[in-house]
């Protein structure tokens, strides 16, 4: 009898973070029917994610970010949980510095971007509220021409992001 061995597959890479991200981007790109909704903001990302996912789950098979898996490690791990059965993904996109949301959007390829608000969160890293707004605006800047930006009308910094996108803009507010 021939003995079968089950050995693990091991990849040697120079940078494990880049390898994780590129694997997640590759996997996401293969799911051509998937629609991704990206959510960012200083506060309210998790509540907004839960609300959107709850509504979408009535008609679609949805994957959503678990907990606060919204950074350069968590978002790729979430993308790698996607299966061909998923029709929608609702993903939080957090940041600590400029360029991070751009990178997350490159990986996830959102068609819809929601910005909840801009507040003095991570001010110690970015230095000014305007820099925080610019970092959050990276989500709407990354949307495709046929995408949709959903912006908080009640936050002037978020509303100003309508000038930063080629996508259709919808607003919400009180």
Where are these regions (language model features)?
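Beta-strand->loop->alpha-helix junctions that form or flank phosphate-binding loops
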Residues: 1, 14, 67, 167-174
């Amino acid at each position: 009898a021939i003995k079968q061995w089950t050995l693990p597959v091991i990849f040697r890479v120079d940078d494990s973070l880049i390898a994780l991200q590129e694997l997640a981007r590759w996997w996401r790109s293969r799911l051509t029917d998937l629609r991704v909704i990206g959510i960012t903001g200083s506060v309210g990302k998790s509540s907004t994610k839960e609300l959107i996912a709850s509504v979408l789950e009535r008609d679609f098979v949805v994957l959503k970010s678990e907990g606060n898996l919204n950074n350069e490690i968590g978002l790729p791990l979430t993308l790698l949980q996607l299966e061909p059965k998923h029709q929608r993904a609702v993903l939080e996109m957090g940041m600590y510095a400029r360029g991070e949301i751009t990178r997350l959007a490159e990986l996830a390829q959102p068609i819809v971007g929601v910005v909840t608000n801009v507040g003095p969160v991570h001010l110690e890293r970015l230095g000014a509220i305007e820099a925080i707004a610019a970092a959050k605006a990276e989500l709407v800047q990354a949307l495709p021409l046929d995408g949709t930006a959903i912006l908080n009308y009640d936050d002037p910094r978020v509303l100003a992001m309508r000038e930063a996108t080629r996508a259709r803009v919808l607003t919400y507010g009180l």
